[in-house]
Amino acid sequence: MINQKKRKRIIELMKREVVPAIGCTEPMAVSLCVAKATETLGCTPTHIEAYLSANILKNAMGVGIPGTRMVGLPIAIALGALVGKSEYGLEVLRDVTDAEVAQGKQYVEEQRISIHLKDGIDEKLYIEVIATDDAGHSATAIIARDHTHFIRIEKDGEVLLNQPLKKHQTEEAPTKDDEECELTLRRVFDFATTTPLEEIEFIKEARRLNENASREALKGNYGHSLGKTLSRPLGKGIMGDSIFSHILSATSSACDARMAGASIPVMSNSGSGNQGISCTMPVVVFAEENHNTDEELTRALILSHLTAIYIKQSLGKLSALCGCVVASTGSACGITYLMGGGYKQVAYSVKNMIANLAGMVCDGAKPACALKVTSGVSTAVLSAMLAIQNRHATNAEGLIEDDVDRCIRNLTRIGASGMNETDRMVLDIMTHKSCK
């Protein structure tokens, strides 16, 4: 068993990374930054300038904004200024009303908002907002590296907060605290399977929120309605009425609603609601239909979510690699555990996932993310089925090595560094295509 001090630090890490969110986290992070700048200014700004990293732009261009029936950054920025509350974090717009949405639309139409690509930065998650009023006062708020992490706040040139970013953990010598919380797949598995149950029951909230989001989504017509399609006669006729089809339907329906801008909270993972859904719903549905115990489900959810957090530590919050690869790898581990697998089989499931999905490109948050989530989740089930029979991709195949942690590093090296040019080309295509 992992000692109490290390368990405490891992639990703190999980509670930072597994948090509720309403709407896609990138536009919500921009709304949060606008809300903070507005609160610092002390009045509704007459003009707002937003300087954003390429990955923030990419993930905010085509996704629905909760409660608005609108898509994209301008309305998210306007509502952040008019009604956003920074104390709500990624639920910054949870109190928005129809009347306030109308005010937000007017704010956008008055062309008070300017959005720019921030040049000369290395951070893939960067949001800088400058809010000004008619009297010439200004306030600046900057978020970087994490969706809710403010690194600088200014008012009229006076610095109120300044927390320069440290180098990424992989670029500097680890501190004692880093070493205490340094993860490997073995440590993730041991934590999930041996930690006293009462210490990890907080993860049940992920089940409650994401299961509710999945159910609510089936009541409406959101996005491409993939989840609904899979649950109807056509879907059942082709996919069958099985654990597999139920997993796909439950997971994709929650993603349908979220990407369409439904005001339904979900439990996110590492700054992504879709990743939180993908870490949760496949595990929950499998456990229910496989008749696993409540304890087994709780431990499987911890294993799924913590595996995703571990992979994201070296990948980064945003990258050219689709996040469903990471989250679905977590759910593959959770499902393998629920099938009765031990550490060896869980490691096999990770190798199977990397052998299949490495290189899936992220082309921004949008309704079609439900399709990618379903691809990831279906691969998770297949990977677990192979792993539980001790079948796995081997050292002779592509990115796979005998050491599973090195396999994970191979995946994240590609996503964090190797696909940077791909990322630039994707954004170029997205910003120059003709939309009619």
Residue ranges with predicted function:
Residues 1-11, 43-56, 242-261, 293-311, ...:
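Acidic-glycine-rich active-site phosphate/pyrophosphate-binding loop
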Residues 2, 21-25, 55-56, 143-147, ...:
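A structural signal for small-residue-enriched, beta-sheet-centric alpha/beta enzyme cores
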Residues 6-41, 45:
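N-terminal signal-anchor module of multipass membrane proteins
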Residues 20-36, 264-281, 323-326:
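Conserved phosphate/anionic-ligand binding catalytic regions in large, soluble enzymes, centered on
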Residues 31-131:
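Early transmembrane hairpin of solute transport permeases
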Residues 37-38, 286-299, 309-375, 388-395:
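Hydrophobic alpha-helical bundle architecture
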Residues 44-48, 88-93, 114-117, 197-204, ...:
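Flexible, glycine/charged-enriched surface loops at secondary-structure junctions
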Residues 109-261, 428-436:
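Signature of multi-pass transmembrane helix bundles
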